[in-house]
Design a protein with these regions (language model features):
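Conserved donor-binding/catalytic core segment of Leloir-type glycosyltransferases
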Residues: 153-156
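Short beta-strand elements of ligand-binding domains
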Residues: 64-65, 87-92
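Alpha-helix capping/helix-boundary segments
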Residues: 69, 94, 122-124
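Short beta-strand->alpha-helix junction loop in the catalytic core
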Residues: 138-150
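A short, active-site helix/loop in glycosyltransferases that binds the activated sugar's phosphate group
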Residues: 98-101, 113-136
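N-terminal pre-catalytic "stem/leader" segment of glycosyltransferase-like enzymes
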Residues: 1-70, 74, 82
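Membrane-proximal helix-turn-helix segments that form the acceptor-binding/catalytic region
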Residues: 50-57, 78-85, 95-116
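A short acidic, amphipathic alpha-helical/loop segment
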Residues: 73-78, 101, 105-109, 126, ...
Length: 156
């Protein structure tokens, strides 16, 4: 079975991936509840992580959108202990975003996943340059879903 964690986010990219995962018949293992404050969000995410222990089975696949504040490494470790594979889709790196993580901390955290999906060659190069040995795929896109009509380069 294929799973993802669809925690509501005001971030368009994360919402787009949730929509894409649903269209690909991935199951959302998030716990849906109204969040009134930070404490509620914290406990919802904690419950969601705990739920993965009971839901995941050997051979399953878990897609994690990154950054996944708190518990990212725990999710990967739970999946691995259950015989599951994890794919991490990186939207942004904490090393650049808030400068709370060093490059070494970020690479150590990402080393727990089985596969990484990045936006572009620059991000992939940066990760490799800083020691990331996890296999990676490159989307070469920035926006996932758009109402705009695509155009070919020769039409521009």
């Amino acid at each position: 079975m294929n799973y993802y964690i669809g925690l509501y986010s005001p971030n368009k990219a994360k919402r787009d991936i949730d929509e894409i995962m649903q269209s690909m018949n991935f199951k959302d293992i998030a716990i849906q509840m109204e969040e009134k404050n930070k404490a509620a969000r914290f406990f919802r995410k904690l419950l969601c992580v705990a739920k993965t222990w009971f839901v995941l089975k050997k051979g399953d696949l878990l897609l994690i959108q990154y950054p996944f504040k708190k518990y990212y490494s725990v999710l990967c470790k739970i999946a691995r202990s259950k015989g599951c594979k994890t794919i991490t889709l990186i939207h942004d790196l904490g090393t650049f975003r808030r400068q709370k993580l060093t490059a070494e901390m970020e690479i150590e955290r990402l080393s727990h996943t089985d596969y990484i999906i990045v936006h572009n060659e620059k991000m992939k190069g940066w990760l490799e340059e800083h020691g990331c040995a996890v296999p990676m795929g490159n989307l070469e896109i920035f926006d996932y879903l758009s109402a705009a009509e695509p155009c070919r380069e020769d039409e521009e």
